[in-house]
């Protein structure tokens, strides 16, 4: 996947965000009340409903151009939600010696596919000797018995879900609502 990033920074534009999660469960219930259910999903379907009530014409042009580059709902991209930050979390070494970044959502662990703004600590001492590749980190100075913790921002791999429409409210003030859905 080419590295495409949502063009509007959540900190630079006025916005609102609603996050919802869904699991597609097929179920059947007998007359006696016995229930059978199955779920084919491994990961939840997370949806972001974003509203930008006051975008400038320049920001709207960026967003429209980005929507066109993604061919509407076809191509996925990276989106960083305002709350997508991990603070001082222990990360674990895999069999290759790399450390997988993850987010813990109330005990449900999701691997992070892309992170930035990373700070790494080996045995509570900050180190600058590390590399990041997507959601994996290599920390050459960490021994297998070392405790590695990290702080990072993580991105969601998403696509647009539906059309993009812009409402002009005043000169150089536009309102836009966007729906994004996670993809794997």
Residue ranges and their predicted role:
Residues 1-119, 125-127, 132-134, 142-184:
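Extracellular/virion structural assembly segments
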Residues 137:
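Expand to "…catalyze enediolate/carbanion chemistry for C-C bond making/breaking, isomerization
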